[in-house]
C-alpha cells in the first residue's frame, strides 16, 4: 500500500507554514521587546498624569470646602442683616417724642439682646468645627484660595445713634459682596480644574490604550495561535510517520 504524494505535500505545506508562523512569532516577540521600552516611558507619563489629575481632584475638593465656608458665612450674614434691620427700626422708634422712659428702656433692652444675637451669629458660624469668620487658606487646582472674613465689631452699635447702625449695615453689604465674588471666583477655578482633570485622565487613557499596547496584545494572541497551529501540524506529522512505519513493517 502506498502513501499519497498529495498527502505528503499537504503535510509538508502545513509544517512549512507552522515553521514560518513560529519564525514570525519570534519576530513578534522581538518587536514586543523593542516596544516595551516605549511602553515603559508611556506608563511613566501615564502615572504622572494620574498623579496630576489626583492632585487636581483634591484641589477641587478643597475648593468646594472653601465654597462651603463662604456659604455658611453668607447664611450667617443674612440673619445678621435681618437683626441689623431690626436695630434700625428700633433706632427710628427711639426718635419718637411720644415714648416715655419705660418704653425707651424696653427698646434698649431689645436692642441689647439683638446685639448679643449678632455676636453669637459671628461666634457660632462654623464649618467642620472651625469658625468661618477668620482667614483660611485652601490649596486648590491652580493655586491658593484665601477666605478673609473678619467678624464686624458690634460694640459701637446703639439705637441712640442711627449712623452707627447704617454704617454697620454698609459693612455687612460689603462683606456679603466679597463673599459673592469669592464664590464666583472659586466656582470658575473649579470649572477650569475639572476640565484640566478630565484632559489629564483622557491623556492617561490614550497612553494606556494606544495602538502600541494593542499591538503587544495582538502579538501575544497571534503567538499562541501560531504555536497551536504548529502543534497541530506536528501532531499530524507524527501520525503520518506512524502510519508509514506500520505500512513498512
Curated annotation (Swiss-Prot):
Please classify the protein's predominant subcellular localization into one broad category.
Answer: secreted
Q: Which GO terms describe its molecular function?
A: structural molecule activity
Q: Which UniProt keywords apply?
A: Secreted
- Mind naming one GO cellular-component term on file for this protein? bacterial-type flagellum
> Where does it localize?
Secreted
Which InterPro entries does the entry link to?
A: Flagellin, Flagellin_N
| Function according to Swiss-Prot or TrEMBL | Might play a role in virulence.
Query: How is this protein organized at the quaternary level?
Result: Interacts with FliS.
Q: What is this protein called?
A: Secreted flagellin C
What species is this protein from?
Campylobacter jejuni subsp. jejuni serotype O:6 (strain 81116 / NCTC 11828)
What does UniProt list as this organism's lineage? Bacteria, Pseudomonadati, Campylobacterota, Epsilonproteobacteria, Campylobacterales
